[in-house]
Amino acid sequence: MTKNIRKVSNIRYASIREMDISNGEGVGVALFVQGCPFNPHCYNCFNPDTWDFNSGKEWTPEIKDKFLELIDRPYIKRVSILGGEPLASENLDGVLDLVTEINKRYNFQKVDSANPCKIRVSEDKNTDKIRLLSSHKNIWLYTGYKLIIDYSESKRQRKTVFTLLPYANTNVVNDINEYRMLCENDDKRRMIAESVDFIVDGRYIDSQRDISLKWRGSSNQRVISVQESLKQGKVITLE
């Protein structure tokens, strides 16, 4: 008789902050994934220990369960995923799996059986609306990628599409092969981006550091309301 073994995507993590008040609005839990593909790394990066993909600790099914238990506490209103780089190709499967699970459990959404990566709001008419409001866990994603919105409208189609670029200005790219590598798996990257509540985008730029800013380190970074941006077809920021 063989024993069923649960598996999670092969990512690693640097640390878990059980009570986080700095990486998003309200009290939350923060996951710092391991590995950052950007070269060179951000000058004076806050988390240089997260650069190496082979460092950190293994993200096992047991660790994932413990992380979800931390989220389950009623006073936790937010989950933040940082790094490292959560949208690095090496981290996409694990981050997508976690975001999907959080939405299923806490945001009263369910996975579309025709497309396991696409999340849609549950149509259950018996849902307790009071509990719905109190149980929602906002998902914040911090990424060095720059969010671009493509919007098209016609008689038959009204569509908002997220594109995530590894550099805000492609003129700074020295190695085209490196740029292509950073753009691999864009579909998964887009799925993650469209499934969270807020994205803090852009690489940290030390010369634009501003300690007066909320939830980010430099003025080039933006706090984007994802779902509102999808509705309006343009980038909507909190500030």
Question: Where do the model's predicted regions map?
Answer:
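Auxiliary Fe-S-binding modules of radical SAM enzymes
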Residues: K3-G24, D72-P74, N103-E239
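Canonical Radical SAM [4Fe-4S] cluster-binding loop centered on the CxxxCxxC motif
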Residues: S9-I11, I21-P61
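Short, conserved beta-strand segments within well-ordered enzyme catalytic domains
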Residues: A30-F32, N44, R78-S80, W140, ...
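Flexible loop residues that form catalytic
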Residues: T50, G84, Y204
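Short, small-residue-enriched loops and turns at beta-alpha junctions
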Residues: D52-F53, E85-E90, N174
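Glycine-rich, highly charged phosphate/nucleotide-binding loops
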Residues: E58-D72
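Charged helix-capping and loop-helix junction motifs
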Residues: T60-K64, D93-V99, L182-D187
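Conserved glycine-rich "GG(E/T)P / GGGxP" loop and the immediately following alpha-helix
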Residues: Y75-I102, I211, N220
